[in-house]
């Protein structure tokens, strides 16, 4: 079965498709197809029908001839070779011609034959596609015109007016002509003799369309051939036709474009006799000689010479060649201009030198050799000097020639008058009260009472204009106003007379000179008396201590000698010689601006301040019920810590301790015990503590009383002290004990010696010389440095 297949594989599976090696392969038959009886069941035969008398040709049989041609050709094939080998594939198109005459077209634009075959006779019936479909096929439409356009409001008051206007516009549009064949048929206009292919699928080129020069040479014509053809009008005597004007623009628009005319390239002598041209409007048709020509509705016999087409052809060729010559000349001119401009640029580049000195930093870039650098610098200097000399020579030559040209030219034409000198008129200062002050009577000369006409100056002549022009100085300085020296003096207590400016009159004699009055000379602003010039010494006159010495600081009191709030500045250190009851007071009384001794006033305890946070000694409730006991944060006082002194207490009262004062150490610090050397300052409070004035604890000094038993403190011996430069605590922060004052004493409450520091809550105790604390009525402790 394998050798009977048409796939080309034989029994021995070694052949290429021949009869000896096996069956032929499909598409690989050599030297034509095999005979009909070779393959009973191959292509073209059927097992059921037996052998086919004429087997089918293979679809690749045309490749046989192509392979033969390819075997003969050698080398690479280009596109031209391939297209040439394929042979011409164009065929001539034949227009379709109906079998019988078609009926005339209908008025509604449809084809008469198709309408007659499909819809029957529909003469004088408006075409309605929806009605026709419903009548023939029963298809009803739901078309609504307002879905695609504006809905007409037929009930409007101006509907009829708008309908008439629409009809007028429709008639105007339908009456217009169009070169489009489709639009012309829709408007019912008469069609021309062009066939359907030319009207609907052809390209109609406008008469004045641009045609490139290469296309003109290929077509054998110039652009002049594409101009609109004129309308020929023949004379009655049969002479040469004369171009005539179109009858009307409407007739020119209605005429379709003329068919393309072919122009022969044969010479004039070898041309056969051409038939005459029949002219009707703008359509030209070939007719015989002495034929009738319809011109403006009149039949005229015209004779056209057969040499006309040859002359026109030669004329068009001449115009085309001349146009090409003009274009070539224009291109050559442009090229020469570009070359000239390029030459100018090259010349400028060769001769131009920068008119600036050569920068020093460019020399290493131009050359690395020092000798060459010096040469380059010398050349640049010489070129710069030459450029400057050239400019100076040009500047000297130009002004020397200009006056010669101006003087040599003489013209009788009037020259424009030069600008007149600007005269500034500054009015005098009017009097302060013009109603009370009147101008004194001025003697008026007799000539002023007469009616004298003003004498106008004559028109300036060319000589006067030239003289005025020579007086103008272009290098004059800027105008600066200066007061008149002959102005009348101004006195505030006397009326001032504003001088009147009289018109310029020619001098008539000594009478005019006698009428003028002498005006005293003086300063225009200060008049008679000028102010004396004084010398100002800025260092001496503007010295605030010129009339008094600078007061020493110790002589200035602490009071505020100005009205308003009285302010006193406390000294940073208390004087050791001050009396025990010396205290600083701030009073609004102007009689006591400075501190003075006063008796301790009886007053209740100091009200506690309410800072945000504070801590008290354990076992004592806070004086004001703040939850958590948060009063003051833990902080250490600065080196300049010196609170203001307080006032003594009055009648002893049982009160809770006051809150912590600003800038005071904390009362108590919670937590683990710390190193004494780094222990921050702390304060202790006692609700009732007797006040015992006197000196601080020392050798044999009195001891302080405490409300409860204190642990023994073996620090009673005098220690070596150092002077404290500031009133703040020492680096080794001691512990402070804070106690309120009480007037009466409790002898049974005696305790061991007090700690090193005890302080009243109202003030801090300043230290005296040697660091010893000075006692006072408000002091109940000492500070040990």
Swiss-Prot record:
Protein location:
Cytoplasm, P-body; Cytoplasm, Stress granule
Biased composition regions of type Gly residues, renumbered to the chain = 9-21
* Disruption of the gene: reported phenotype: Abnormal sexual reproduction; decreases MFalpha1 expression and abolishes basidiospore chain formation. Decreases virulence in a mouse intranasal inhalation model for pulmonary infection; virulence is completely lost in a double knockout with CRZ1. Resistance to high temperature; resistance is suppressed in a double knockout with CRZ1. Resistance to tacrolimus (calcineurin inhibitor). Resistance to dithiothreitol (ER stress inducer). Resistance to tunicamycin (ER stress inducer).
Pfam families listed in its UniProt record: LsmAD (PF06741)
Claim: Hydrolase is one of the keywords in the record: no
- Which residue ranges does the record annotate as region Disordered? 1-120, 153-285, 403-446, 486-519, 669-785
Q: Which domain of life is it from?
A: Eukaryota
Q: Which UniProt keywords apply?
A: Cytoplasm, Phosphoprotein, Translation regulation
Broad class of the protein's primary localization: cytoplasm
Q: Which GO terms describe its molecular function?
A: mRNA binding
Ranges of biased composition (kind: Pro residues): 690-700
A single GO BP = stress granule assembly
Q: What does this protein do?
A: Involved in post-transcriptional regulation of gene expression by interactions with poly(A)-binding protein.
Q: Which family does it belong to?
A: Belongs to the ataxin-2 family.
What name does UniProt use for this protein?
PAB1-binding protein 1
Organism, as annotated: Cryptococcus neoformans var. grubii serotype A (strain H99 / ATCC 208821 / CBS 10515 / FGSC 9487)
Gene from which this protein is expressed: PBP1
